[in-house]
């Protein structure tokens, strides 16, 4: 809104109005504003949650070997993150930009889904919350909306990157002059760092492109569902999900920024995406909101984000990556989320297979994987066999959290480095 106001005032030579035309200025304003909102509003909101007794106990206090008591800690803190994202975007963003619209829809959509889950847990005293099938329906619905919008909107275009070679060596990367709709996505080790979903069905001839879009929509649905659930599982320790997501958000912000500048996109050999510069405003709001939230969520947590926050930040990461055509980099960038997902899947399937044979068996001491590292041998079921018992010693959750952050930083660096590998 302020963007449009100052754009109008610029006609009258209003001092400073021209600054709002620069993405860099609006991005810095967004990250500062979102941080202040989450830090200042957060304190008042946490006190409100306490007065209303909207609190949560430790999900499983028996797994905390350090006897850290987490009784009566407010939940639904994800509302702080959502508000701190939306306000700067509404004030500083171009609200007619299709990418900004999609990100705002994603934030509100999954924020509502997570809120319903937390509401059922807190007010209806149902620990299971919203039934799993309704969560999946909500995630699939969002993925379908995002995928179809990117397919149907005439504003969603790219300029493909092309390598110029001489004597077998790449001497320059240029971009085609024409904007085009495309099912291509960025992935390392492929020609021009691009993979076209339509290539999977090239045998269909003229129909390959249309079927390629169907594949793209299905991939979108899968990525949104997987990453939002991964972030949800990762939210099991103080500061874990917020810290990891801020690091991932920073990496996506860098990729969005270079994708919106044709020269920088050429340097990294990735496609140029006109209009994607507005995503930098959004991701700066996202990062600022998470950092401000960490002020209260770092160990020992004064507030939990709940599913209101974790489902939302996971969905934001997924949709953002899809919009900038970097969804196939998610297994690297969001490696922590992937491992959390896989650890739960392996644990459940291995347990069920053992149950059919009449004995108890598990892969890890506990799942998701972060709980494995803080579970003592004394806490294990003596009647159950475990594939992985190491480490014998346990770590404090703050140490586990910081180490997971470090792993995410390394994965973020690898994600960017892989784009320069020829």
Curated annotation (Swiss-Prot):
Disulfide bond annotation, renumbered to this chain:
none
Which Pfam families does this chain map to? Glycos_transf_4
Quick one: where is this thing mainly located?
A: membrane
Biological process terms from the Gene Ontology for this record are:
cell division; cell wall organization; peptidoglycan biosynthetic process; regulation of cell shape
Q: Name one GO molecular function term.
A: phospho-N-acetylmuramoyl-pentapeptide-transferase activity
Q: Which reaction does it catalyse?
A: UDP-N-acetyl-alpha-D-muramoyl-L-alanyl-gamma-D-glutamyl-meso-2,6-diaminopimeloyl-D-alanyl-D-alanine + di-trans,octa-cis-undecaprenyl phosphate = di-trans,octa-cis-undecaprenyl diphospho-N-acetyl-alpha-D-muramoyl-L-alanyl-D-glutamyl-meso-2,6-diaminopimeloyl-D-alanyl-D-alanine + UMP
Record's bilayer topology term: Multi-pass membrane protein
Location in the cell reads: Cell inner membrane
For this protein, the Enzyme Commission number is: 2.7.8.13
One GO cellular-component annotation of the UniProt record comes to:
plasma membrane
Q: What InterPro entries does the record point to?
A: Glycosyl_transferase_4, PNAcMuramoyl-5peptid_Trfase, PNAcMuramoyl-5peptid_Trfase_CS
The coenzyme or cofactor needed here is: Mg(2+)
Q: Which ranges does the record mark as transmembrane? A: 28-48, 71-91, 95-115, 136-156, 208-228, 239-259, 279-299, 313-333, 399-419
Instruction: Kindly state which keywords UniProt assigns to this record, in alphabetical order.
Output: Cell cycle, Cell division, Cell inner membrane, Cell membrane, Cell shape, Cell wall biogenesis/degradation, Magnesium, Membrane, Metal-binding, Peptidoglycan synthesis, Transferase, Transmembrane, Transmembrane helix
In which pathway does this enzyme or protein participate? Cell wall biogenesis; peptidoglycan biosynthesis
Q: What does this protein do?
A: Catalyzes the initial step of the lipid cycle reactions in the biosynthesis of the cell wall peptidoglycan: transfers peptidoglycan precursor phospho-MurNAc-pentapeptide from UDP-MurNAc-pentapeptide onto the lipid carrier undecaprenyl phosphate, yielding undecaprenyl-pyrophosphoryl-MurNAc-pentapeptide, known as lipid I.
What protein family does this chain belong to?
Belongs to the glycosyltransferase 4 family. MraY subfamily.
What is the protein named? Phospho-N-acetylmuramoyl-pentapeptide-transferase
Q: Which organism is it from?
A: Phocaeicola vulgatus (strain ATCC 8482 / DSM 1447 / JCM 5826 / CCUG 4940 / NBRC 14291 / NCTC 11154)
Gene assigned in the entry = mraY
